[in-house]
Regions:
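Extracellular adhesion/carbohydrate-binding repeat motifs centered on closely spaced tryptophans
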Residues: 35, 39-42, 88-90
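Extracytoplasmic/secretory-pathway segments with low complexity and glycosylation-like composition
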Residues: 31, 47, 54-59, 63-80, ...
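Secretory targeting and sorting signals
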Residues: 1-24
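Cleaved targeting-peptide boundary
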Residues: 25-31
Length: 222
């Protein structure tokens, strides 16, 4: 009996691994494959935030024009000080390309919408955030902790069903880019989502999307 149980568990683990690998293989450009109609922004090497083709073209143009929009002799922000009428684009904290204010607003909006523009946000790799759930007959409470985030950034949490990511809540990273201790993200209700659900994390300071584990809070109501 014990040998049969061990064999069954091994078979199940193998099937799960095969399923996971197949899911990754199904995405033509890896875990950050964009949904139809979107492409990578490419504001810097490794920038895989999904945007419209027009915004990627605009981003490339901003790179070309960036040097001409800096104060030639520097200023209060050093050599990256922008001329009057321009601001840093800030697709991430170190992005000091000088652009019109509308372009910075666009970059912030694109970061905030990064999850919904991925083909499968639940296929993204594990990041520095972990989650845990305290369960109850009516659902449960989702808590998160972690590091490696943008300092002072808004950190958003989603559940990843097969159709559309559902927003669960948000936290704010501290000055070191961490979520100290176990902080409550949301109170979740049974029968209100996929079960179990993959939790997706968005670092809004960079638009980076990762996963943080799963929750059983959406279990069938008792």
């Amino acid at each position: 009996m014990l040998a049969w149980l061990i064999a069954a568990v091994a078979l199940l683990a193998g099937l799960m691994a095969t399923s996971s690998s197949a899911m990754a293989t199904d995405l033509p450009y890896g875990p950050y494959t964009c949904a139809a109609g979107y492409v990578w922004r490419d504001a810097y090497a490794g920038d895989q935030v999904c945007v419209t083709p027009a915004i990627r073209t605009q981003t490339a143009t901003e790179h070309a024009l960036g040097p001409s929009r800096r104060e030639p002799n520097g200023g209060i922000y050093g050599p990256d000080t922008c001329r009057q009428g321009f601001v840093w684009r800030a697709t991430r904290p170190s992005d000091h390309v000088c652009v019109p204010p509308d372009s910075r607003d666009q970059a912030s909006s694109d970061n905030a919408n990064a999850v919904s523009r991925l083909a499968d946000p639940g296929a993204t790799p594990r990041g520095g955030v972990s989650v845990t759930t305290t369960s109850s007959p009516t659902g449960g409470r989702l808590f998160a902790t972690g590091s490696g985030l943008t300092p002072y950034s808004t950190v958003r949490f989603y559940s990843a069903p097969t159709t559309w990511p559902v927003s669960l809540g948000r936290l704010t990273a501290d000055a070191a880019g961490t979520l100290q201790g176990w902080q409550q993200v949301a109170a979740l209700h049974c029968d209100s989502g996929p079960y179990p659900a993959t939790i997706v994390v968005l670092d809004q300071g960079t638009g980076l999307v990762t996963t943080a584990g799963t929750t059983d809070a959406f279990h069938p109501c008792s």
